[in-house]
């Protein structure tokens, strides 16, 4: 996280900001605050109940390819950069999203930062990614499954 944050912050231009949400990891939040205390364009946030608002305000979201964050990002149509996965399901999630144009990734932290900054500055790529997210998501799937189950049970 520290290296990726450094790579991103070193590429910020005037007016651009980075928000780093650390959740319950107080040690990481503290060390990031120390690392970036002189940079007014970097905001380190610990646990917050306002992740949805931060996500809605984001031009690009960097996140590991877990199911919840990734699904929320595509539901909100947020351009997405998937960072290093935890081996297993997250590796498959990242491959699924990238192969369908719903996210980008990189082989190392510098490439992740470069790809995310390029995405933030490329309106056409953002539109294409949002279109891919819309085409590959099914926000009403839960409701459809519920109706199908109700129909099957009533027969």
Residue positions per predicted region:
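Donor-nucleotide binding loops and adjacent catalytic segments primarily
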Residues: 1-57
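Short, glycine/polar-rich helix-capping loops at beta-to-alpha or helix-loop-helix junctions
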Residues: 28-32, 69, 88-94
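Short alpha-helical segment that forms part of, or immediately flanks, the ligand-binding pocket
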Residues: 52, 70-76, 95
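Acidic donor-binding loop of glycosyltransferase active sites
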Residues: 56-65
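Structural loop-to-beta junction motif characteristic of Rossmann-like glycosyltransferase folds
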Residues: 59-60, 76-85, 101-102
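Conserved donor-nucleotide binding/catalytic region of nucleotide-linked donor-dependent transferases
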Residues: 104, 109-110, 117-134, 151, ...
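C-terminal alpha-helical cap of glycosyltransferases
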Residues: 138-155
